[in-house]
């Protein structure tokens, strides 16, 4: 299954409701409980400068792009066992597509 085309505005709402308590997206944004996500696409797991990642995140070694985020966001702890991300995931494919569309827009 490919990544469904997402709606940026719906994705922004999901980010605000489910992600913003732990993540920022703007350039130069601070790390919170989770890393700042600016420049996420094309970056390898565990590589945001200045954030203390688990060894599991550093060792995963994949590059964040639409398909890897789509799989990760469904069940983060299954995709990266040992991650400290406590988010249970987004089970609905369309919600993951919306969030990815927003992240692509907001983290450039």
Curated annotation (Swiss-Prot):
Name of one Pfam family that matches: Cytochrom_C
GO molecular function: electron transfer activity; heme binding; metal ion binding
Subcellular location: Mitochondrion intermembrane space
Chief localisation class: mitochondrion
Keyword Transport: yes
Segments traversing the membrane: none
Keywords: Electron transport, Heme, Iron, Metal-binding, Mitochondrion, Respiratory chain, Transport
Alphabetical list of Gene3D superfamilies matching this protein: Cytochrome c-like domain
Binding site for heme c: 19, 22-23, 85
Modification after translation: Binds 1 heme c group covalently per subunit.
Keyword Electron transport set for record: yes
Any single GO CC term annotated in Swiss-Prot or TrEMBL for this entry: mitochondrial intermembrane space
Function in brief: Electron carrier protein. The oxidized form of the cytochrome c heme group can accept an electron from the heme group of the cytochrome c1 subunit of cytochrome reductase. Cytochrome c then transfers this electron to the cytochrome oxidase complex, the final protein carrier in the mitochondrial electron-transport chain.
Family (UniProt): Belongs to the cytochrome c family.
Name used for this protein in its record: Cytochrome c
Species of the source: Lucilia cuprina
Lineage: Eukaryota, Metazoa, Ecdysozoa, Arthropoda, Hexapoda
């Amino acid at each position: 299954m490919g990544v469904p085309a997402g709606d940026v505005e719906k994705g922004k709402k999901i980010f605000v409701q489910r992600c913003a308590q732990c993540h920022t997206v703007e350039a130069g944004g601070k790390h919170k409980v989770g890393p700042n996500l600016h420049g996420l696409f094309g970056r390898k797991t565990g590589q945001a400068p200045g954030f203390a990642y688990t060894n599991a995140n550093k060792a995963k070694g994949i590059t964040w792009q639409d398909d890897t985020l789509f799989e990760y966001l469904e069940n983060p702890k299954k995709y990266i066992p040992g991650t400290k991300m406590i988010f249970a995931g987004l089970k609905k494919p369309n919600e993951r597509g919306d969030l990815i569309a927003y992240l692509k827009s907001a983290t450039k």
